[in-house]
Structure formats: C-alpha cells, structure tokens
C-alpha cells in the first residue's frame, strides 16, 4: 500500500466511467486532497464497479420510462481519523442488500454476483468499512465506505 490522494483517484475513476456513461455523475469533496494508504488499482476497481452497478440498475428504470435520467452522487467527507465516501444513485435499489453481499448471488442475466463481494473485500483489506442499503424501496442505493485517513 502506498500514500494516495483519494480525491484525485475518484476524479480519474469518474472520468474513465464517463467515457461509456449516459448518466449524470456528480462529485463533491470538502477537501481538495485527502490521503489514505491504499492500492490505487484496487480502489479504482471499487469505484468503477460501483458506478457500473448503478448504470446497470438504471437500465431497468429506462425500460419502464425511456425519459429516465440516471444520477450518481459521490461525496467525500472527512474527520480527523476517517474519510467517509457516499455513493448514491436514483436507480431501482437492491432487493436484498444482505444477499447482494453473498458471492455468486445475482439478479442480472449477465452478472456473476462477484462485484459487491469483491468491493467489500478490497475495502476490508484497506482497514475500511463497506455498508450498502436502499435509500427508499425502489428509489436508489446508498453505499457508505469508511477508510482510515493519513496526514498529508
């Protein structure tokens, strides 16, 4: 693990995701730079996976309403010891957030059911906490990730 600027990494992940995205992705951070010890490639994988999951959820909404516009809001807040990342989307939500963390469980025709368990494992390897829940039934997902912060 090495010292990385999480704000910069998320911005890069968003730029990469936007190349194939039709959704609106908003990003807000109270700090211009926030440092953590991490594996840049693995954390990038986390952020891309979470954005991709939202995109896939939006497809179901678009089937019901062709004018639907997917929105992903990503926000970082920090205190003295931890940063908290919040990913919110306005997709269909997750039927059972606990089951979604079970390897090989999927509700998608093409999914492997490994995305969220891998994301959780990567966050745990970074001494972090990964939480997932619905904002409201059928109204989107809220994912919270806490990671230990280090000094600049």
Report the location of each language-model feature.
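Conserved catalytic submotifs in the C-terminal HATPase_c
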Residues: 24-34
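Short conserved segment of the HATPase_c
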Residues: 94-104
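Conserved micro-motifs of the catalytic ATP-binding
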Residues: 35-38, 107
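Detector for a conserved hydrophobic position within an alpha-helical segment of the HATPase_c
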Residues: 123-124
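A conserved beta-strand-to-alpha-helix junction within the catalytic ATP-binding
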Residues: 2-14
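ATP-lid-like helix-loop hinge signature
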Residues: 55-78
